[in-house]
A protein has these predicted regions:
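Carbohydrate-associated surface elements
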Residues: 46
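Short beta-strand-loop/turn "lid" adjacent to the catalytic site in phosphate-handling enzymes
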Residues: 7-43, 72-76, 107-128, 151-154
Length: 410
């Protein structure tokens, strides 16, 4: 598919100055010494990591671990995926020469260069948040093979040239393949239209997941941050995105898909105004395991409310209202924890990504947080990707100028 798109650009005679890839975090492929992929990558929602955090923390101290990598412990993290493979004596892990996160793998196919981009590596729970290099202590303690962890490349740099055969096949010639914020959240946060004096700059990257946090200069590696379940992820310009991963619009997406499958399809422009008028006194914990991947999301919500003495939603509008006000309540809880760890409380909240189009959720969030909400851009990830390519090419000076371009463009 990537080559098809590049061929289309070549056929139109377009001059391509750069190519860059960003994706979701934590997932990876393993390649052998000959560059062959050792089996298809496994989705982070796979059950193989079940119980792995408990296994890992029998061997390493969680507080000391957080003080090094500053990562929110989540069962889906690369650390636990790799440890599950080690426990299972995976032949793929034994034969692996390189670990490549999803965007690293695609970049490898385009360039032949096997390296690991900083922001995507920071989702693994295997990166030292201070040195921005691998957390060799944890890697060694768990007996993971050192040699699979490659050179870290920073966003805003060239990670390789388009392979000659692909350059000829697509008609594009020599093109730089650029390291951007390969973790889509990092690219999205780069495109937050904040001003230089807006510190700390607070954001919610709103999609399937909601990533709520601030951009800071140095990681926060305190016990308070660990207990509050915040993570230090890599950002553009060497900055840190200090955030919490929250189940976002996943619940809404599942509801809409379920209703469609049952012949009860709903349109957002119809159901959201109905939810605006609905009233229900129920707040559900959106991160609860009950809502991770149930057979029926609607039934999971109804059952949770019934078994926890909450008002049970009777209509689709009440279900949607319950979900959105619960999300806003979770945002408020996370922001309260965040403010306790910052030198001053946040003054406004930027909501970016597809979820920024949900005006009801934006309003509920503003009310719950008690601060103004600034919505957009919707395509923050794409904008951040492209403008970081411009940064690598010297067309943009720094992250502040990048954000000025965003402000002038929306």
């Amino acid at each position: 598919d990537m080559k098809t798109g590049l061929k289309m650009a070549g056929a139109k005679g377009l001059k391509v100055d750069g190519i860059a890839i960003d994706t979701w975090g934590v997932d990876f492929g393993l390649i052998d010494k000959d560059g062959n992929l050792l089996g298809n990558p496994v989705c982070y929602r796979d059950a193989r990591t079940k119980g792995m955090p408990e296994e890992v923390f029998k061997q390493i101290d969680p507080s000391a671990h957080y003080a090094i990598n500053g990562t929110q412990v989540m069962e889906i993290n690369t650390l636990f995926q790799l440890y599950s493979m080690k426990k299972a004596n995976s032949p793929q892990l034994e034969k692996a020469a390189h670990l490549l996160f999803t965007p690293d793998l695609f970049s490898y196919y385009l360039t032949g260069e096997a390296n690991n981009e900083y922001t995507i590596a920071s989702t693994s729970e295997l990166l030292n948040a201070t040195t921005k290099d691998w957390d060799w202590e944890t890697i060694d303690q768990l007996g993971l093979p050192r040699h699979i962890f490659g050179k870290i490349v920073m966003p805003g740099t060239v990670r390789g040239k388009l392979r000659r055969d692909i350059a000829e096949e697509t008609g594009l010639g020599e093109v730089d393949v650029i390291a951007v914020g390969s973790h889509d959240t990092a690219s999205a946060v780069a495109a937050v239209p904040a001003t230089e004096d807006e510190y700390p700059m607070a954001f919610i990257s709103s999609g399937t997941w909601s990533l709520l946090g601030v951009e800071i200069e140095k990681p926060i590696l305190t016990e308070e941050a660990r207990k509050a379940e915040f993570t230090n992820e890599g950002g553009i310009g060497g900055r840190i995105t200090f955030l919490q991963n929250i189940t976002g619009l996943w619940i809404m997406q599942r509801l809409m898909a379920e209703w469609k499958e049952n012949g009860e399809e709903q349109q957002f422009d119809i159901i959201l105004p109905q939810a605006e008028e609905a009233h229900i006194n129920a707040i559900i914990p959106v991160d609860d395991a009950a809502f991770q991947n149930p057979a029926s999301m609607q039934q999971a919500i109804i059952d949770y409310c019934a078994t926890h003495q909450l008002q049970v939603p009777q209509t689709k509008a009440e279900i949607v209202r319950c979900v959105l006000q619960s999300l806003a309540a979770k945002y408020a809880e996370a922001t309260a924890h965040l403010n306790e760890m910052l030198p001053q409380p946040i003054k406004c909240m930027h909501i970016i990504g597809g979820g920024s189009q949900n005006q009801l959720l934006n309003r509920l969030t503003s009310e719950a947080l008690g601060v103004p909400v600034i919505a957009g851009p919707i395509e923050a990830t794409g904008m951040g990707n492209i403008l970081t390519q411009a940064l690598a090419k010297g067309e943009i000076k720094d992250i502040d100028e990048l954000r000025a371009v965003v402000r002038q463009s929306i």
